[in-house]
A protein has these predicted regions:
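Compositionally biased alpha-helical segments
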Residues: 1-47, 52-53, 57-61, 113
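Outer-membrane pore/translocation modules
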Residues: 16-23, 30, 76-192
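Membrane-embedded beta-strand positions of outer-membrane beta-barrel proteins
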Residues: 40-42, 73-75, 129-133, 151, ...
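Transmembrane beta-barrel domains of outer membrane proteins
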Residues: 61-65, 117-121, 134, 154-156, ...
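Repeated loop/turn-to-beta-strand initiation elements of outer-membrane beta-barrel proteins
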Residues: 67-73, 124-129, 160-165, 198-206, ...
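Outer-membrane beta-barrel "beta-signal"
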Residues: 259-271
């Protein structure tokens, strides 16, 4: 029974409503096991006509969280190609026996990224220590493989049911194997922000992720990654998303663009 903002208990001290953290807690909230969430989404494009392209993008994330620690796994993959006329030595389009232009598929994007994070909550569960290891490849950016490892201190700045914000500050080591350009490695500082807001009675989720690796020996070669999007639940665990991202690589290979900007519309499954 609730009377004047207090829970009245038989043969026990009364409790103010703000003293009740969790009603009907799940097992993980009592210290048993993990609370597992995640999603897998894809964006597929198939164009035929004046523009003939094929694009595939896959993105996956899963988070296992307990009262003691949190494990985050992320991966994404992008592949795209375009059909272009096959030409002879004089630059003229080749044709088949029926007079149709012969076209060949040429790749225009081929990149992937995997990342794993481990966070250990301290005595104040809003604070945590963490390790982050990641690998990526982008052949068209001349990156055969880039690996990085970071150690950081993090804090949950906001932990409301409808608004969360985590901030992390740490150190990193980055090693890049280029396809053509001379390989590079450096140590740096990391500043990361992760936020989510539930809008319109949790019918829409606004999410934001900012990951920065500051090259302490040459700041103009730093890496900045920003992602902002909206997720909309559909039915039976399906969801749609609209997402904008900007990746700035100050240490890009010579002749390659430092800034990649994308706008994606996704559909996927969440659990």
């Amino acid at each position: 029974m609730v009377v004047d903002g207090e829970v009245v208990l038989d043969d026990a001290d009364n409790l103010a409503l703000d003293q009740l953290d969790v009603a009907n807690p799940e097992e993980w909230e009592q210290g048993y096991g993990y609370h597992i969430t995640g999603r897998v989404t894809s964006a597929i494009e198939y164009n035929r006509g004046n523009t003939e392209t094929d694009k595939l993008n896959l993105d996956a994330e899963t988070i296992l969280e307990s009262l003691r620690d949190r494990i985050t796994l992320r991966a994404d993959y992008e592949d795209s190609s375009a059909l272009v006329p096959d030409t002879d030595d004089d630059g003229n389009p080749k044709q088949d026996a029926e007079g149709n232009t012969i076209k060949t598929s040429q790749p225009t994007a081929d990149n992937w990224r995997v990342e794993g994070k481990y966070d250990y909550f301290l005595s104040d569960p809003r604070n945590y220590l963490g390790l982050n290891v990641g690998f990526r490849s982008n052949v068209f950016a001349d990156i055969d493989q880039r690996s990085y490892a970071t150690a950081y201190f993090g804090r949950k700045l906001l932990t409301r049911e409808t608004l969360t914000l985590d901030a992390e500050l740490g150190v990193a080591y980055v090693d890049t194997d280029f396809v053509v350009t001379e390989d590079d490695s450096y140590t740096g500082a990391t500043i990361n922000l992760t936020a989510e807001a539930q809008l319109f009675d949790s019918r829409v989720t606004l999410y934001f992720r900012q990951a920065n690796i500051i090259n302490t020996s040459s700041t103009e070669k730093s890496i900045y990654r920003t992602k902002l999007g909206l997720r909309f639940p559909l039915f039976l665990g399906l969801e749609a998303a609209a997402e904008a991202s900007a990746d700035y690589d100050g240490g890009a290979a010579e002749g390659k663009e430092k800034l990649d900007e994308t706008l994606k519309f996704r559909i996927g499954y969440t659990w």
